[in-house]
Amino acid sequence: MLNKLSSLLKDAGISLTDHQKNQLIAYVNMLHKWNKAYNLTSVRDPNEMLVRHILDSIVVAPYLQGERFIDVGTGPGLPGIPLSIVRPEAHFTLLDSLGKRVRFLRQVQHELKLDNITPVQSRVEVFPAEPPFDGVISRAFASLDDMLNWCHHLPGPSGRYYALKGQLPEDEIASLPKEFQVESVVKLHVPGLEGERHLVVIKPNRI
């Protein structure tokens, strides 16, 4: 699996240490193992997880501004766990409402010795952001409108919303609440993944 991961990283132009690669592989192995009992992801094949979960998460790392992030609706830690491995200087709060997912995240934190994540079981709309976050990240979480409605209290004054999407959601972008604007749209290159991937970066309008 290490050779497969190294090849994917090379194709994506991403440079990681051997320790980071081993952490990512350990996470995939845990996800594969726990998935049998906990049904954490529909992806069953570990090699497919490397593409659809690991690479699909870490390609957004260069676009994240700040040091404190919250991954809302993280599920089994996507994209938060892979991002925490490739951005060890940043801190990631991993938020999910299901206890079984958070139990898995805590086990990952323990086994991989990740001191820059905080798994939390909570609904996003009632979670207090103290202090506010630099970035709110979502992957397959909700529409842009719902994301902004549920997460509006989470970022600080200069914070950003980072929404990982497949095809560019032009209808969702067109119907954004007037309090927000799209700062940038990045077309992502994920080696081995068919279909389009986009990162939509949104910021509050300052009147």
From Swiss-Prot:
EC main group: transferase
Keywords of the record: Cytoplasm, Methyltransferase, rRNA processing, S-adenosyl-L-methionine, Transferase
Family: Belongs to the methyltransferase superfamily. RNA methyltransferase RsmG family.
Source species: Escherichia fergusonii (strain ATCC 35469 / DSM 13698 / CCUG 18766 / IAM 14443 / JCM 21226 / LMG 7866 / NBRC 102419 / NCTC 12128 / CDC 0568-73)
Function: Specifically methylates the N7 position of guanine in position 527 of 16S rRNA.
A Gene Ontology molecular function term of the record: rRNA (guanine-N7-)-methyltransferase activity
Gene encoding the protein: rsmG
Catalytic reactions of this protein: guanosine(527) in 16S rRNA + S-adenosyl-L-methionine = N(7)-methylguanosine(527) in 16S rRNA + S-adenosyl-L-homocysteine
Its EC number(s): 2.1.1.170
Protein name: Ribosomal RNA small subunit methyltransferase G
Alphabetized CDD domains for the sequence: AdoMet_MTases
Chief site of localization: cytoplasm
Keyword check for rRNA processing: yes
Binding residues for S-adenosyl-L-methionine: 73, 78, 124-125, 139
Protein's cellular compartments: Cytoplasm
Keyword S-adenosyl-L-methionine in record: yes
Pfam families according to UniProt: GidB
One Gene Ontology CC term in the entry: cytosol
Annotated InterPro entries: rRNA_ssu_MeTfrase_G (IPR003682), SAM-dependent_MTases_sf (IPR029063)
